[in-house]
Curated annotation (Swiss-Prot):
The chain crosses the membrane at residues 24-44, 55-75, 91-111, 113-133, 139-159, 178-198. It comes from Paracoccus pantotrophus. Keywords: Cell inner membrane, Cell membrane, Membrane, Transmembrane, Transmembrane helix, Transport. Pfam families: DctM. InterPro entries: DctM, TRAP_DctM. One of its GO terms (cellular component) is plasma membrane. It is found in: Cell inner membrane. This is Putative dicarboxylate transporter subunit. PANTHER family: C4-DICARBOXYLATE TRAP TRANSPORTER LARGE PERMEASE PROTEIN DCTM, SIALIC ACID TRAP TRANSPORTER PERMEASE PROTEIN SIAT-RELATED. Belongs to the YiaN/YgiK family. It comes from the Bacteria. GO terms for molecular function: transmembrane transporter activity.
Length: 206
């Protein structure tokens, strides 16, 4: 099983396959290993896994469809103009980062990360990269929008993780301590840029 990690990371780093293709390779490797090495995986188990994956995929796609529709409403109502207003304030770097965090957190509550990146990053990036490192800004955007996956009203992960349809509400009730810890980590990432920039600097150093 540990070879799966080596296979995925090595294949991506070596340019053998893309991250999307790596997921297919991982599934194939897991099926072959379970069936022929551990000998605990039957055709009935495979069909059950496919069925559970299909049900989960349908649930996620329905959430994404609703989120995209709501994203269109937000765009029509002027959310991009809110980003322009933040830029027009001419804030200090610290105040700007706090405003960007707030904007992205609210935006991420109603939309999945990809549309959020496509809509807000082109507006904020030119101003942000003039004040902070590009890697730092990218991490802040990704972390903020990812938090939206576990916060109502959309919260895609809230509906993906539970197996029982009644569990999302119970999951939401258990969230506050973890969400506070996530907010603390976000503030640390925001005000300690080295945590966001050291790995890219090492990885791409010549």
């Amino acid at each position: 099983a540990l070879l799966l990690i080596v296979l995925i990371v090595g294949g991506i780093r070596g340019g053998v396959f893309t991250p999307t293709e790596a997921s297919v390779v991982a599934v194939f490797y897991a099926i072959v290993t379970s069936a022929f090495v551990y000998r605990g995986f039957t055709l009935a188990d495979l069909w059950g896994a496919f069925l559970r994956s299909a049900i989960m995929s349908v649930a996620v796609l329905m959430i994404l469809a609703a989120a995209r529709a709501f994203a269109w409403v937000l765009i029509i109502e002027g959310v991009p103009q809110m980003a322009d207003a933040v830029i027009a304030m001419d804030l200090s770097p610290i105040a700007f980062l706090l405003m960007v965090n707030l904007l992205l957190l609210v935006f991420g509550m109603f939309m999945d990360p990809l549309p959020g990146v496509m809509i807000l990053v082109p507006i904020l990036a030119p101003f942000a990269t003039a004040r902070i490192a590009r890697d730092h800004f990218a991490i802040i955007v990704i972390v903020n929008l990812t938090f939206g996956l576990m916060t109502p009203p959309v919260g895609g992960l809230i509906f993906v993780v539970p197996r029982d349809p009644a569990e999302p509400s119970a999951l939401i009730r258990e969230q506050p301590p973890f969400f506070l810890a996530a907010m603390a980590s976000l503030l640390i990432l925001t005000f300690v840029p080295a945590l966001s920039t050291w790995l890219p600097q090492i990885s791409f150093a010549r």
